[in-house]
Amino acid sequence: MFSKEDLKGPSHAVQLGVFVDEALSFVDSHGMPLDAVAVSCGPGSYTGLRIGVSMAKGICYGRNLPLIGLPTLEVLCVPVLLHHDLPEDALLCPMIDARRMEVYAAVYDRALSVKREIAADIVDEHSYLEFLNEHPVYFFGNGAAKCRGQITHPNAHFIDDIRPLGKWMFPLAEKEMVRQNFKDVAY
């Protein structure tokens, strides 16, 4: 696995090609086999997703590799599951800022089984009550901070500084590789 971060801000279009070139050069120069390419398939910035998916498809097509698409919200769950001690009945609610008071969010259990599908939500004090009334719910991702003032239920917990980094894709991509759940690079 190759991972590199740039925390300077949204420069996806500028940096991605350079990062990919470095990764492929490293793999090639060290004789390492490349088994597949994993890419985030959203939700998120439409332009950013198009750039990332196009780059991934190009690599897969050129090297005859399978493509693995992973939901960004599931990727956000990985560091929470790895680095936070959650109760058995905890639910995870990753959130991505969708501007204004809207977030892209889903609800998962600790096994990443979907409890509520991905949706664009306008958050208010009644949001997620069907889950909060029954379980501790952990909110995280860049959309969670703006919801802190609206979601005040005692079962609501907020985790800061969770970002969708490439390194968090690995355990999910590995599962998809075993299942041979690949995306079509032609479309």
Model-derived regions: residue spans:
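Residues at secondary-structure transition points
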Residues: 7-18, 46, 50, 54, ...
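DPxDG-like acidic metal-binding loop motif
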Residues: 38-72
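Surface "functional belts" at beta-alpha junctions
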Residues: 11, 66-164
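N-terminal beta-alpha supersecondary unit
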Residues: 1-43
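Stable alpha-helical structural segments in soluble proteins, enriched in small hydrophobic residues
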Residues: 23-27, 62, 80, 169-177
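Acyltransferase
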Residues: 115, 157-187
